[in-house]
Amino acid sequence: MMRSILLMLFILSSSAYGTEVDEELKSILRETIEKSSSFEDRFEAEVWLLQKSTVLAKFIPNATDRLSLLKDIHNASTEAGLPPEFVLALIEVESHFDRFAISSAGAQGLMQIMPFWKKEIGRPQDNLADIKTNLRYGCTILKYYLNRADNNWAEALARYNGSYGKFWYPRRVMTAWEKNWR
């Protein structure tokens, strides 16, 4: 009951600041929360999804697609032991949330995974444009580099990007995190 009251206060305060929360978004948000298992509780899910959805709207206008992606990012990142907000920042820098993005080096999808990883792990049939597959690969790779770097985010991000020893890439991810996802 208290959680519902707090959510309504949050929604009403959003309306007071001119950011109208429409009925369709509220309905989609409820459905997404019901299907998500990576949150501690329903209230945490409601607040996190609503906050991040507002920021993600500039990249993904469709509310259903946006909330579905946020749920997938939260699930994959928490399963890998990563903060979802850092994964959001990395995706913003890597692909601007374009699941079909392909870099000049051939990296694919949201988290820009190099296709050689499919062969390396014996799964050549995997589709890196598939959101859940791409997130699973990306979060696992990032967590590996974070462990290898003794939880030094700058080093882990540079390794992830293939720019170890340089810090322009970690700065870009950290800036995106501070500006949009923190």
Identify the role of each PLM range.
Residues 4-13:
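Sec-dependent N-terminal signal peptides
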Residues 20-182:
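Catalytic glycan-binding domains that act on GlcNAc-containing polysaccharides
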